[in-house]
Curated annotation (Swiss-Prot):
Gene3D superfamilies: 3.30.70.2510, 3.30.70.3190
Protein name (database record): Putative tRNA pseudouridine synthase Pus10
GO cellular component, one term: cytoplasm
Family of this protein: Belongs to the pseudouridine synthase Pus10 family.
Entry coiled-coil feature ranges: 30-50
Gene Ontology biological-process annotations: tRNA pseudouridine synthesis
Highest taxon of the lineage: Eukaryota
EC number: 5.4.99.25
Originating gene: Pus10
UniProt xrefs under Pfam families: Pus10_C, Pus10_N_euk
Catalytic site positions: 309 (nucleophile)
Length: 500
């Protein structure tokens, strides 16, 4: 089968030149200049119709040659008229409210398009015989062609970059014949697949069903032709744009926070409908970062690499955190903006943040996975009932790692199941507090997920061994700080060094 023969037949069936290229299996940029591509494929130009060039030339004069009617296979989906209508509708929507450089088109196509592709598949097999495979479509599928043809054009005209994680433009299309054709398809389905139809009380007609079940190897052309014309009939009306809905991207903003207060919960602390604390780390950060990206602060998800108790500070480099912001109105964060947010959070006096930045969603694996394999570094102020002896200090200089068995602490049983968890303690060092001979400052490196307070006092033998059992004396914890978290993420950025 020669390309010229194929194209001449397609022309006789009312197929537009862009769809002719689909049946010639054109790719990418080959759709941008139809004349050039047809000549390259040894196809003579049709001088009787205006080529449907995809590049919309500003200020160009319309051709006096006759235009094609509505394409019998794409129903005008790839026409200039539809491109112009689509662009105008996008610009007339809330598109300008989104400050996003990346976009993605999600186009819901009517099933009428799939039925026309199938009708042309049957027609080509009748005309060209075995050279048209009965299992593999003879064209570039409509959905793929949309990505190859429409996406680049829309992105170029909107001055945006295509990205699957960008602003999603949901486009719903329909055609006046779809309702009638779906009814016919239900009847066809019963005849083409009687065994399946007999076992189904209700037949679900879907695009997926058409893709999987309807091809010449599974449905006879004679059966199909009882309900639909082969090749597909010409139509007067083109495809219609029914709605455009915009959904902003999911933006992830990461950084590190330091918790400076011993009277601040990690997330809102509400019990029986009553707030137990006025504020939380989550609320302070979201309050100052969220409005840059969205008005719906309640939709933002706050995550961190672990958490502290209310009375525990987090110092050092801080704890990695991330905000997941759905349907964001903005996708970028300049250093100026990030620095202003950092200063606003710092002004709370309870939380400090730094290294604030937008990160790819894929990087959230750093927060979500392998949590228990991470190391955590703590400093605890502990009290004895007697002055610290040299022996006690020696017993608490532990450089070799050891394992403990730790039951779920009583204080968290209301939100954690009762389990005994093995945990690794990597090192312990201790020194006497300068101002109190009965007090110890103990530095501990542990596996993430270790309950440090219970590691110190043992909680009536529920943690074994404990530091108290190691020295053989009662010991309690007075204050605790997290001083380090073994997670090198997100990367360090100094937002204070921005251009004025």
């Amino acid at each position: 089968m020669k390309n010229q023969d194929l194209v001449e037949y397609l022309r006789s069936c009312g197929v537009c030149e862009i769809c002719q290229l689909r049946y010639l299996k054109a790719r990418g940029a080959e759709y941008r200049n139809i004349n050039e591509t047809l000549q390259k494929l040894d196809v003579k130009l049709n001088e009787n119709v205006e080529n449907e060039e995809l590049v919309i030339s500003e200020g160009s004069q319309p051709s006096k040659r006759a235009r094609l009617g509505v394409c019998s296979t794409c129903l005008g989906l790839f026409s200039k008229d539809f491109q112009n209508e689509l662009l105008s509708s996008i610009l007339a929507s809330d598109f300008a409210k989104y400050d996003c450089q990346k976009i993605v088109l999600a186009i819901c196509l009517p099933m009428s398009l799939q039925l026309r592709q199938l009708a042309m598949w049957f027609a080509l097999r009748r005309r060209f015989g075995p050279s048209i495979d009965e299992n593999n479509p003879p064209d570039v599928p409509i959905k793929e062609a949309v990505k190859l043809i429409l996406h680049p054009i829309i992105c170029e005209k909107l001055a945006k970059v295509y990205d699957a994680n960008g602003l999603m433009i949901n486009i719903d299309l329909t055609h006046s014949l779809e309702g009638e054709e779906v009814e016919k398809l239900v009847k066809l389905n019963k005849e083409a697949f009687p065994a399946k139809a007999s076992h189904q009380k209700r037949i679900e007609i879907s695009r997926g069903l058409l893709e999987k079940q309807y091809q010449p190897s599974k449905v006879k052309a004679e059966t199909y032709e009882k309900y639909f014309q082969i090749p597909c009939s010409n139509v007067e009306e083109s495809i219609k744009l029914t709605s455009i809905d915009l959904q902003g991207p999911l933006i992830c903003v990461a950084g590190r926070y330091r918790k400076l207060s011993r009277e601040l919960s990690h997330t809102p602390w509400i019990l029986n409908g009553q707030r137990l604390m006025e504020d939380s780390i989550e609320e302070i950060i979201i309050r100052h970062v969220g409005p840059h990206f969205t008005e719906k602060l309640g939709k933002i998800t706050f995550m961190s690499s672990g958490r502290e108790d209310v009375d525990v500070r987090c110092l050092g480099k801080g704890r990695p955190f991330v905000l997941e912001i759905p349907n964001a109105k903005r996708s970028c964060l300049t250093k100026d903006e990030a620095f202003a947010m950092e200063r606003a959070v710092d002004a709370s006096g309870m939380v400090s943040i730094h290294h604030l930045q937008v990160v790819p969603r894929e990087e959230l694996t750093h927060i979500k996975t392998g949590e228990e394999q991470k190391k955590k570094f703590y400093r605890a102020l502990c009290a004895l009932q007697e002055p610290v002896s040299v022996k006690i200090l020696e017993q608490l200089q532990i450089s070799a790692s050891f394992n403990i068995q730790q039951k779920t602490p009583i204080r968290v049983l209301h939100r954690r199941p009762l389990h005994t968890r093995p945990r690794t303690i990597y090192s312990v060092t201790a020194k006497v507090h300068r101002g109190n001979p009965k007090a110890l400052i103990i530095d501990i490196v542990t596996q993430a997920g270790t309950y440090i307070k219970e590691l110190v006092h043992g909680e009536f033998g529920r943690t074994t061994p404990s530091l108290s059992s190691i020295i053989g004396k009662p010991m309690d914890i007075q204050a605790l700080d997290v001083v380090g978290i073994d997670l090198d993420w997100p990367h360090e950025v100094d937002n204070s060094k921005h251009k004025e």
